[in-house]
Each structure stands twice: as C-alpha cells, then as structure tokens.
Amino acid sequence: MSVAYEGLNDCVIYDFETLSVDVNRGVVLSLGLLTFSRARFTNNPYSYEELLDSSVSIKYDVKKQVEVYDRKISKSTLDWWNNQPKETTAAVMVPSENDKDISETYNFFVQNVNINNLKTVFSRGNTFDIPFFEGILNDTGKKVPYPFWMVRDTRSFLDGLLWGSDVKNDYIPEGCAEKFFKHDARHDCVMDVMRMQTVIQNL
C-alpha cells in the first residue's frame, strides 16, 4: 500500500453467509469484513489480491446459535447450500473446533476497523447484512459501533452510477472472474469494492 494512504481506510464493507434469510432469528455461518479507502479508487487503485489479503473473516458455531441463542435454520436455505459445489460449502458448512460464538462479533469488528476514522459502512444489501449484524449484537448485549447515518449499500451505489447502461450491479469486472470464489464472505466483500472502483475509474 502506498504510504500516502497508510492508515486512511475510512470505509468498511461486511458480508454474512447464513443458514436463513430471517434477519431477526436466522443462523449465521460466517462474516467477512474489509476496510478500504475510496480515495484510492482513482489515485492508487487496488488489485483484487491486495483487497483479499486485507480482508478478514470469522466462522461461527452453528450448534450454539441454535441451542443458546434460539436462532433458526431455514430448510430451504440449507437445501440451497447442499446443492452448491462441495468446494463452495466445505469451508463454511463443515463444523470446526475453531468456530466462534456470535458473542465475539463485536470485538471482531472493532479490532479490525478503525472506528475513529470510519466514515462509511457498506453492505451489499441493507435489508440483509445490516439487520443481521444489529440482531447479533443485540442478542449478545452489544451496541452497534457506528452511527446509522454512515450506512450505505453497494447495490444502490452501483445502480446510480450505472444508470442508463445495460450493466447490472452484480457485474464482474474484467480480470476478476477467475479470482472470485462464490459464496465466500471475504470474496463477496472484495468483489463489491472492485465493482465500485471499476465504475468510478470509468466515469
């Protein structure tokens, strides 16, 4: 990273993989998170690899969510995961002794985000990832560590900038397709930042 931008990551994007679309009580599998600076989009653009290396994730204990927090698994969502390629599901669906309690979500976030420097919080969909995050913090006695007015969603960001074109908000930027791993929370964050960067560069 250029020294000029060292420590100036003022944006974060996060993404959940889940076992339900119920944002209030659904079980979460993993959370991916990536901090970045929009100032770099034109002056010192990111590579896919740099963003991926900068991203972090936490994988959750599913059983404990059900037994302790009364969170629910959706059969239709579980069936969907079971129909995905094994290489997609292995990393997120197979239980591990390293899986974390959802109570660790708050510390995971604040340890990986410079809250004092934060200006914008992105998710792909603010009716999905954001309420999942807020609900988990509520379940574990924590408050959301950023004000509501920082929140944006990448779909609206991209739709606005792509208005009048035939390009969709889920397009894959040139050179990224072979690097992208579907349904991986870290890769989902990286891809949305690459989408925003590419659109800004082409304005």
At which residue positions do the language-model features occur?
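Active-site-proximal helix-loop-helix substrate-binding element of RNase H-like nuclease domains
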Residues: 65-69, 73-82, 152-191
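Substrate-binding/catalytic groove segments of enzymes
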Residues: 140-146, 163-172, 203
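Acidic, Mg2+-coordinating catalytic module of metal-dependent nucleases/exonucleases
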Residues: 117-127, 131-132, 169-203
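Conserved non-catalytic scaffold segment of RNase H-like nuclease domains
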Residues: 2, 6-12, 17-123
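Substrate-recognition/cap helix-loop segment adjacent to the acidic, metal-dependent catalytic center
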Residues: 113, 127-149
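Residue-level signal for well-ordered alpha-helical scaffold segments within enzymatic catalytic domains
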Residues: 108-111, 131, 135, 159, ...
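Anionic group-transfer/hydrolysis microenvironments
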Residues: 17-19, 125-126, 131, 155
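A short, structured active-site edge motif that brings together acidic residues
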Residues: 56-61, 145-161
